[in-house]
Amino acid sequence: MSELDSQVPTAFDPFADANAEDSGAGTKEYVHIRVQQRNGRKSLTTVQGLKKEYSYTKILKDLKKEFCCNGTVVQDSELGQVIQLQGDQRKNVSTFLVQAGLVKKDDIQIHGF
């Protein structure tokens, strides 16, 4: 009888809160690079999800110098700090972040159009 008791499966609740030590699916932190259409041919590239210990102003300064565009760091209530760049800079930003060693290529998600 003791063997049967140890083999009885327990109930699994998929909607229960995951424990901190359980790193299940969906816990991977991605860097999201999006493009938003403004008026006419103008567009805006946003970078969200970088680690908080990075200096966003220094990253922005390097991005602006590298791509010859203007940009700013915006504080959003839900998303935290977001880097905004003028123009469609999705590919440029992703290659820059990988080459600088800030983000792995697998951790970048590019959105838009």
Curated annotation (Swiss-Prot):
The modification N-acetylserine is found at S2. The keyword Zinc does not apply. Residues 1-24 are annotated as: Disordered. Pfam families: SUI1 (PF01253). It comes from the Eukaryota. Keywords: Acetylation, Protein biosynthesis, Translation regulation. One of its GO terms (biological process) is regulation of translation. The keyword Cytoplasm does not apply. CDD domains: eIF1_SUI1 (cd11566). One of its GO terms (molecular function) is translation initiation factor activity. InterPro entries: SUI1 (IPR001950), SUI1_dom_sf (IPR036877), SUI1_euk (IPR005874). Belongs to the SUI1 family. Probably involved in translation. This is Protein translation factor SUI1 homolog.
